Design a protein with these regions (language model features):
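Domain-level signal for soluble alpha/beta catalytic cores
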Residues: 2-169
Length: 169
């Protein structure tokens, strides 16, 4: 899918990405559980409309690209909060809700599949490479059916970037 997007003229002009979904959800009243942050909205079905509305607000504000709301839907974060059983459901749901927002908007926006660091945020992941590969593979496969390309979000080391690219390319 990335190759197909790159063959178009899409990246030949400036494009606007959406804003910080997690912060916007909190500003709109989301109550985060533990360190789940925006994943709380995916776990609780009552918040799915809030996610769609927030995506739509970014689209209406002029975003050419929206990013799936799965930054905190990584295994390590879910395990820390004792909700690892939601991993598959919430990653798929992040893709589904982004597609729903785009479809409702009837605008030609692309959906970027957010791939966050697979351990902590803003710290290099020094765990065994096979663990990181497994986590990237599982998360990328769950969101892949819903997206136009992957977006590597807040990586803290070139090692993580290389591992992610090896998995998705």
């Amino acid at each position: 899918m990335l190759l197909a997007v790159m063959k178009t003229d899409f990246f030949k002009t400036t494009k606007i990405l959406d804003g910080g979904m997690g912060q916007e959800l909190l500003a709109r009243g989301l109550i985060s559980k533990g360190t789940l942050w925006s994943a709380s909205a995916l776990i609780n079905e009552e918040n799915h409309g809030l996610i769609v509305d927030t995506h739509r607000s970014f689209i209406d504000a002029g975003a050419d690209v929206i990013v799936t709301n799965n930054f905190s839907a990584r295994k390590v974060r879910l395990e820390q909060n004792k909700v690892e059983n939601t991993f598959e459901y919430i990653n798929k749901k992040a893709g589904e809700l982004a597609v729903k927002a785009r479809d409702i908007s009837k605008k030609n926006v692309l959906i970027a599949g957010g791939l966050p660091p697979q351990n902590g945020t803003y710290v290099p992941d020094d765990r065994d490479k096979s663990i990181i590969e497994k986590n990237f593979k599982e998360q990328s496969e769950l969101i892949n059916p819903y997206i136009d390309f992957f977006y590597l979000d807040v990586f803290s080391s070139s090692r993580e970037v290389e591992i992610a690219l090896d998995i998705i390319c």
